[in-house]
């Protein structure tokens, strides 16, 4: 599973960053 923040930073930048971080 690739980093969601890099996969779709526009779909949920805040959510992706929270999951990634």
Swiss-Prot record:
Entry keyword annotation includes Oxidoreductase: no
N6-acetyllysine PTM sites in chain numbering: 6, 11, 14, 19
Residue ranges, annotated region (Disordered): 1-21
Lineage top rank: taxon: Eukaryota
UniProt keyword annotation of DNA-binding present: yes
Function field: Core component of nucleosome. Nucleosomes wrap and compact DNA into chromatin, limiting DNA accessibility to the cellular machineries which require DNA as a template. Histones thereby play a central role in transcription regulation, DNA repair, DNA replication and chromosomal stability. DNA accessibility is regulated via a complex set of post-translational modifications of histones, also called histone code, and nucleosome remodeling. Has broad-spectrum antimicrobial and antibacterial activity. It is important in the antimicrobial defenses of fish skin and possesses strong activity against saprolegnia, the most common fungal infection in fish. It is also inhibitory to fish bacterial pathogens, such as aeromonas hydrophila, vibrio alginolyticus and E.coli D31.
Protein name: Histone H2B 1
Top-level taxonomy: Eukaryota, Metazoa, Chordata, Craniata, Vertebrata
